[in-house]
Design a protein with these regions (language model features):
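Amphipathic, heptad-repeat alpha-helical segments used for oligomerization and assembly
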Residues: 225-233
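A helix-coil-helix interface module used to build multimeric assemblies
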Residues: 1-205, 209-218, 222-224
Length: 233
């Protein structure tokens, strides 16, 4: 199967392709859920009254098939075919196999660049939330331990010598405070990930009348990237 960027009458040596691809398909499967979620928002925007680049009938047809793919992803039965370039190509391939030319319309007004970026942003946002929840749970545990063991004494060392009395509670509390600082870093990372890159195209925007505010709201982003070049950085 020809790759998305493969030039006519040219092919890549199988060993080179295997080396460069590596474990990409495995990592791409992690993005599959978010790729479909991003596409659902994209086609809804394309069919909106402010854009009208997709008919309501085509939007409903695409949405139905995308949701079927989403069910397969969540069931763990979705896979990327051998020779398929990436998860984005796999999803489009399934749509065009089922819907013909209608399936190809999903790529209107969207570059592979901003499609990949929105997948990554959605993935990072979800994982940061998971980690933040785990950090919060561990913080609560350490604080309880700190309070429970505040009177359980241990020697405090400096320069390998006993210096002052300390306690298990003090040390549990120290690690709890470290987690507070980690949570602040996670919050900052979440804010950076919580910006919508859709509509930035390949880094220079789009000539289509895309509604970036709409996809921002549909995907739960705080705001779109203001500068389309920065969205790609």
């Amino acid at each position: 199967m020809a790759k998305l960027w493969q030039k006519e009458n040219q092919s890549t040596d199988a060993k080179i392709e295997k080396f460069t691809i590596g474990h990409d398909p495995e990592y791409d499967l992690l993005l599959a859920h978010y790729d479909v979620i991003g596409s659902l928002a994209h086609i809804k925007m394309l069919a909106s009254d402010s854009v009208k680049l997709l008919s309501q009938a085509d939007q409903e047809t695409l949405e139905k098939e995308l949701k079927k793919i989403l069910v397969d992803i969540e069931a763990g039965t979705f896979s990327i075919d051998a020779g398929m370039e990436d998860v984005h190509s796999q999803v489009e391939y399934l749509l065009t196999q089922k819907l013909g030319d209608v399936g190809k319309k999903i790529h209107a007004g969207r570059s592979r660049n901003d499609q990949v970026l929105v997948d990554l942003k959605l993935f990072m946002r979800a994982k940061i939330e998971e980690i933040a929840h785990s950090v919060s749970t561990l913080f609560d545990t350490l604080i309880k331990k700190s309070e429970a063991h505040q009177s359980d004494l241990i020697p405090g060392y400096t320069h390998l010598q006993i210096a002052m009395p300390s306690s298990f509670g003090l040390w549990f509390g120290a690690y709890a405070e470290c987690l507070v600082e980690d949570a602040e870093l996670l919050e900052a990372a979440f804010r950076l990930a919580n910006k919508n890159p859709l509509g930035s195209g390949a880094g220079y925007g789009s000539s289509f009348p895309l509604n970036r505010e709409m996809t921002t709201q549909l995907l739960g982003f705080e705001a779109p990237h203001v500068n389309v070049v920065n969205a790609q950085m």
